[in-house]
Structure formats: structure tokens, C-alpha cells
């Protein structure tokens, strides 16, 4: 950016801040809305995406269809900065006002998004420096969304100016109930000069001196000591695991700062009954610390996309719900999910079977969602997401999905007040570590490449977390997620600790204390191996966990091919009695072996151990288990914690979720993820199936049709 442009931006920024101060509330008020009366159900809506000749009259037709279907909420505005501000400093609202007003007259609520994730062409033309410098390559050309440096001061100037104008314009509109800041935000792999300068400032604050940094990162290796902050090398070719880990933390901090910054601006103007949220994409992220971002939000939202047809089993939705509900231990929103087919090409078009859209809605509600919205209302006719279809297809006419959405919405109008604000109390939690996710990615334990080469990882931290959650899900055990930052884990009976590769001594002590005080821990390999700076501990593994684990080890090995466990101790069967990728040579000191490798060399060491420590137990897996073995080990831990019962007797396609509704009554969701009817025995107190109105007695036989659901409210 030229000096004249920089001066112009700085001057405008200062004047804008002065001018907007009078508009902003002197003290932002906390979110304070009356409880919603019903579950919200709707879709993202983009009248502006319609073919130009359809736009004027299409709005009324869409609203008529929405009213006929009992749609109650739409999300709008987050994708079209160029319409809000077609040229620098000229703001247009009429195009959206007509939509918001029409929705309001129809009784449909609006969530408005800040449109900052896709910059307009005029900004790129005037300020190409706002584009991200990729860590992995050159600056990209304009054309893709999410291609800017979110910490760039020029970008931030334009973003804050737009946000202030937008929120001020709609703050008094009673139909706008909330604000979504940005959209599926990430760091975008940014390596701009300002990003690196900020990183060095972060290191100064954290480590104080370069001498402390050198010691923490062991930079005397290969003679890479940093002698003066001005000599800090760039990230691109860094080999230090400490450097790479801290850089990943810095990228997470940038995202937290950016979204907190947007949320703070919105709060200056919004009404106290307008919430602030962010729609996280469905997966957990290497460059986003959702736990920290959630502190800046009133409500957490997530966009979970999932398998359809024969690949819909509810696990993806359940894991997303469990994770995002756990961030604030509160109900959450689903801001996007499958309407019809998904994907950016026509090579992955699998529309849902009859019943799957409806089942998906109740799946989310059973995990604690208070809103379900589709992406999106109507399919678009051109662009990258042409084949990411909405409720209406490209012909914009009512169709099979619309009929199912209508059926579901009509049901929610009747029973939604008994479903909203479901309170879920679980006794099992998975400890999730962003640091371990990234550090294991830097030093993978499983590779598809031949020896001495680096191929794509065939298993990693995420696959282990997913496997463990799937085991719990398939056992019908409600699950929360906890994080290293949580003060303690005492609310749970069982703590699942997947590959806690990065941990300071305090976190490991907290886990040991949990066991000592009567908790049950299932911990998997690589846990306790490295400290908070990704340096391997200089004591025998598993470091501070040694006493609680009851073993130590000095060696480990990759496994070139899967090994069986001797005598199939968990009755997994020949095909599934297998472990892969990695084996730690566990030497029991107090622990007992639960399984040994069936191998002439590896067979001298246990693959799985269990140790009684204090009033609790710690079960440890020194290798990567098959899915069937993992489920069996998890089930054994649950039995020892007295957490099994009738829910584990359900037929495999049926899943059950429990919670207490706003009226203080226990709800039991039964969900059939199969194309066949399923019959089972209802084991709880008598109640009423809210969807049919039928009485349900204890020990009664219940039958669910394919892709069907029952919701029993106890008396």
C-alpha cells in the first residue's frame, strides 16, 4: 500500500471512530433475551442470488411457501459485502430492507450475518495487500472467498466500518434476533508481514528473552539459536517442533482476537435481546480454538454436514453437538446442515432418503440444539456451490424435501415448546487437545509412504478422537468434551484421554488426581510424552503419569502390518482382533496386562494395561486399536464405572439420547438410522410419545419405522 493510501485509510479510520462513538452505546449491555417459546426452524435465504428477472416477485412466493411450511427463521446477509457497500463508503440497505420487512410481516425471524468473509472487488483493486500471503505459497489471486488476512489493519478498517453501519441500521428492528459474526472463520494459513511481526511480539511477551526461547525450543540443535528478536527466522522452513506448535497457537489466537473484536463491535450497537454467535464449520480445526472463541459469544453455532442415504448414522451430528454444546455447557444452534445434496461438484450427489431430513432435525435437538437451519432455502443457479442444493431445487417449486421439511415444521409447532432448552447431563467426557492435534500432525505416527519417506497420514489425532466418540455413540453413552483449560473434571465418572501428546505437568497431575479421587480414565498411546513446548520429557515415559498409569516404557515401534492380540481377549473376532501403526513397549510396575501382542518379538509387552490408583482406575492403550476392539475396551471401562444398562441392549441402528426439558420432565429420544423397522423394549418410566400422542408404559415394546423417531416424555 502506498504512503498516500495508508494515510488516507488511517485518517478515515480515526474520523469514522469519532463519528460512530455517538451512535454506539456507552456501555455494551449483556445479552438478555426472554427465553424462546419454541425451537427455531428455517434456512439461509438469499433473494439476491435469484436470477435477476425473478427477484422482484420471487420474495413473496418464497415467503408464502415458508409460511405454508411453518418456517420460523432465516439467516441472511453474510455473503454479499459488495451489495452492502458497492463502492468505498457508499452503503446500500434497500435491497435487504425489503426482505427483512417482508419476513417480519410474515412472522419469520432474522439472523443477520456480518459479510466480512468475502471481500468486494473494489477493495482488492484498491488494496491488494489485504489478501493473505500463504504459508505454503505465493499470494493468491482474487476470486475465492476467505482469501484475506484477518489481522490486516486496512481490512479491519473497512470491516469495522461496515459492521458498525450494518448493526446500527438494524439494531431497532424487532425481527432481527441475532448477529452472526463472520462465517466459518479460520486463519487461512496467513503468513503476511503483520502476522509474523505479531508472532514475534507474542513470543516476547510469552518467553521474555531469546535465551528463554532457545532453551524452551532446544534451538541449539542444528545451531539455530536466536540471538536477538530481530533475528527470528520466518515460519516457512522451520523444523523446530516448538516453533511449529507455537505458530499454530498464534494462528488460533489471531482467530480468537478477530472474532472477539467483531463481537465487541456488534455489542456496542445491538439491542440486549439480540445474540451474538459464530457459525463454526462442522469439523474441529487446527487453526481455531473454539473453546476460547466461545467466550466472546452469547450462543455457539455449528454447521454440521453429514452422510446421507446408507451413510447416515447420526454420529457426525452427535459429535458436533456434543463438542459445541460443551464449549459453554449450554444449548447451541445449527446454522447450516444438509437440505438436499452437498459438494462443490456433481460427482457427489446423494440426496437423503425419505425420512432422513426429519430424522436429522430430531438428531440435532436430541443433542441440545435450539435451532436447525438448512443451507439453504433455494438452490443457486451459478457459481461454486451450484450443486450444494437447498430445500427447493433449481426449478424453485415445492418438492419431496420441501414436503418433509413442512411435515417436520408442523410437528415442531406443536411439540417444540417441550423440546427447546433440553438440559443434558453426562457422566463421560473426552479430553480434547488442540495442541496434541497439531503436534502429532507435525510428527505423524502413521504414514502411507514407504520407509524413510513421508506419505499422507493414515491415522492421526482426529481419527483417534472420532473412533473413541463413535465407540461411545454406538454404546448409547452420552458424551461431553472437556479441554485442558477446564479447571477440573470432577463432574464426570469417566474421562477419555486420546493421545495427549502435549501437556504440561499441571494437566497431567489434574488427570492423576481425577483417578486418585475415584475417576476412571481411558488413555491412549503417546500421552504424556512431550511437554507444553513439544519437547520430549527427559524422564521415562509416560512422565508424570507414571504412578497413576502403573507402567513405564523406553522404546516404541511402528508396526509394518496389523498385529493380532493374543487369544482375542475382547472377543473381537479374527478380522477385528487387530492393532496397527504403533506399539509402545509397556513395562508394568503396578498395572496388570489386559492384552498382549500375538507376535514372537512384540509379544513380551502388553498392548493394553489397567492400573488401580487411589480410588480409581487408569486403562491405557499402547497401540492403535481396530474399531471393534476400541468399542470393547470402552465398554469394559464403562462397566467398571457402573455406567451400562438398558441403553446398551438396543438394536444397533437405534440410538437413544436423554435430557430434561424446560418443564422439568425427562425426555428420551429414540432414533432409527436404518432402512428397516426396529423393535425394542422401552425401559423407563411411563410417558407419552410426543410425536404420536400415544401412551408408553414401562417395559412396552416400541417399533420404529425406517428412519423414524420417537420422543417419550415421562409423566
Can you say where each PLM-predicted feature lies in the sequence?
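Carbohydrate-binding surfaces of carbohydrate-active enzymes
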Residues: 272, 305-715
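Short, acidic/polar
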Residues: 51-66, 282-293, 353-361
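Bacterial N-terminal signal peptides that target proteins for export
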Residues: 1-11
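The substrate-binding groove and active-site-proximal loops of carbohydrate-active enzymes
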Residues: 41-54, 79-94, 141-158, 185-189, ...
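Polysaccharide-binding and catalytic clefts of secreted carbohydrate-active enzymes
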Residues: 136-299, 303-316
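N-terminal carbohydrate-binding accessory modules
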Residues: 25-73, 86, 101, 418
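Aromatic-lined substrate-binding rim segments of carbohydrate-active enzymes
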Residues: 59-138, 262-269
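Aromatic- and acidic-residue-enriched carbohydrate-binding clefts of CAZyme catalytic domains
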Residues: 36-40, 77, 84-94, 120-153, ...
Amino acid at each position: 500500500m502506498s504512503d498516500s493510501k495508508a494515510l488516507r485509510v488511517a485518517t478515515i479510520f480515526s474520523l469514522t471512530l469519532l463519528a460512530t462513538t455517538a451512535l454506539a452505546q456507552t456501555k455494551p449491555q449483556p445479552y438478555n433475551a426472554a427465553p424462546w417459546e419454541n425451537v427455531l426452524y428455517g434456512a439461509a435465504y438469499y433473494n439476491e442470488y435469484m436470477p435477476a428477472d425473478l427477484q422482484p416477485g420471487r420474495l413473496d412466493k418464497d415467503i408464502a411457501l415458508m409460511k405454508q411450511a411453518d418456517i420460523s427463521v432465516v439467516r441472511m446477509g453474510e455473503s454479499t459485502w459488495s451489495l452492502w457497500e458497492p463502492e468505498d463508503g457508499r452503503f446500500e440497505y434497500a435491497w435487504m430492507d425489503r426482505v427483512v420487512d417482508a419476513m417480519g410481516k410474515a412472522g419469520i425471524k432474522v439472523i443477520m450475518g456480518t459479510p466480512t468473509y468475502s471481500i468486494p472487488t473494489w477493495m482488492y483493486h484498491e488494496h491488494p495487500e489485504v489478501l493473505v500471503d500463504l504459508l505454503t505459497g505465493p499470494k493468491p489471486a482474487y476470486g475465492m472467498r476467505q482469501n484475506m488476512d484477518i489481522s490486516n489493519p486496512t481490512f479491519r478498517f473497512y470491516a469495522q466500518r461496515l459492521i458498525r453501519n450494518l448493526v446500527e441500521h438494524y439494531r431497532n428492528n424487532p425481527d432481527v434476533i441475532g448477529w452472526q459474526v463472520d462465517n466459518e472463520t479460520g486463519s487461512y494459513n496467513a503468513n503476511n508481514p503483520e502476522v509474523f511481526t505479531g508472532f514475534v511480539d507474542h513470543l516476547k511477551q510469552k518467553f521474555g528473552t531469546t535465551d528463554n526461547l532457545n532453551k524452551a525450543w532446544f534451538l541449539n540443535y542444528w545451531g539455530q539459536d536466536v540471538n536477538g528478536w530481530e533475528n527470528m527466522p520466518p515460519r516457512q522452513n522451520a523444523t523446530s517442533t516448538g516453533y511449529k506448535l507455537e505458530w499454530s497457537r498464534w494462528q488460533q489466537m489471531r482467530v480468537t482476537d478477530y472474532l472477539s473484536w467483531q463481537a465487541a463491535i456488534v455489542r456496542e450497537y445491538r439491542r440486549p435481546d439480540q445474540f451474538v454467535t459464530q457459525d463454526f464449520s462442522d469439523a474441529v480445526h487446527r487453526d481455531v480454538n473454539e473453546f476460547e472463541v466461545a467466550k466472546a459469544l452469547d450462543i455457539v453455532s455449528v454447521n454440521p454436514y453429514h452422510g446421507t442415504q446408507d451413510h447416515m448414522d447420526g454420529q457426525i451430528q452427535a459429535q458436533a453437538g456434543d463438542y459445541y454444546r460443551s464449549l459453554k455447557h449450554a444449548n447451541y444452534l445449527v446454522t447450516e446442515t444438509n437440505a438436499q445434496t452437498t459438494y462443490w461438484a456433481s460427482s457427489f450427489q446423494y440426496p437423503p432418503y425419505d425420512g432422513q431430513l426429519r430424522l436429522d432435525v430430531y438428531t440435532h435437538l436430541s443433542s441440545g440444539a435450539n435451532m436447525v437451519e438448512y443451507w439453504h432455502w433455494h438452490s443457486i443457479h451459478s457459481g461454486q456451490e451450484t450443486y450444494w442444493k437447498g430445500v427447493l431445487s433449481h426449478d424453485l417449486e415445492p418438492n419431496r424435501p420441501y414436503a418433509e421439511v413442512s411435515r417436520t415444521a408442523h410437528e415442531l409447532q406443536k411439540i417444540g415448546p417441550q423440546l427447546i432448552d433440553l438440559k443434558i447431563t453426562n457422566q463421560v467426557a473426552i479430553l480434547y487437545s488442540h495442541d496434541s492435534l497439531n503436534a502429532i500432525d507435525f510428527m505423524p505416527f502413521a504414514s502411507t509412504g514407504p520407509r524413510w519417506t513421508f506419505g499422507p497420514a493414515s491415522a492421526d489425532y482426529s481419527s483417534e478422537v472420532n473412533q473413541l466418540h463413535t465407540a461411545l455413540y454406538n454404546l448409547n453413552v452420552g458424551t461431553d468434551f472437556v479441554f485442558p483449560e477446564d479447571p477440573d473434571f470432577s463432574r464426570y465418572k469417566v474421562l477419555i484421554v486420546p493421545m495427549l501428546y502435549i501437556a504440561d505437568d499441571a494437566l497431567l497431575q489434574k488427570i492423576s488426581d481425577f483417578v486418585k479421587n475415584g475417576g476412571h480414565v481411558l488413555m491412549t498411546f503417546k500421552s504424556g510424552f512431550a511437554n507444553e513446548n513439544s519437547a520430549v520429557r527427559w524422564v521415562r515415559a509416560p512422565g508424570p503419569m507414571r504412578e497413576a498409569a502403573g507402567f513405564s516404557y523406553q522404546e516404541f515401534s511402528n508396526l509394518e502390518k496389523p498385529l493380532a492380540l493374543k487369544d482375542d481377549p475382547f472377543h473381537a473376532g479374527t478380522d477385528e482382533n487387530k492393532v496397527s501403526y504403533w506399539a509402545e513397549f509397556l513395562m508394568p510396575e503396578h498395572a496388570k496386562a489386559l492384552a498382549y501382542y500375538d507376535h514372537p518379538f512384540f509379544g513380551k509387552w502388553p498392548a493394553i494395561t489397567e492400573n488401580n490408583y487411589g480410588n480409581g482406575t487408569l486403562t491405557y492403550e499402547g497401540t492403535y486399536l481396530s474399531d471393534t476392539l476400541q468399542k470393547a475396551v470402552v465398554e469394559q471401562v464403562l462397566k467398571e464405572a457402573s455406567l451400562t444398562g438398558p441403553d446398551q441392549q438396543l438394536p444397533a441402528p437405534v440410538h437413544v439420547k436423554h435430557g430434561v426439558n424446560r418443564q422439568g420432565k425427562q425426555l428420551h429420544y429414540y432414533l432409527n438410522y436404518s432402512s428397516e423397522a426396529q423393535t425394542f423394549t422401552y425401559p423407563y418410566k411411563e410417558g407419552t410419545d410426543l410425536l404420536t400422542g400415544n401412551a408408553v408404559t414401562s417395559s412396552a415394546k416400541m417399533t420404529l419405522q425406517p428412519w423414524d423417531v420417537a420422543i417419550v416424555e415421562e409423566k
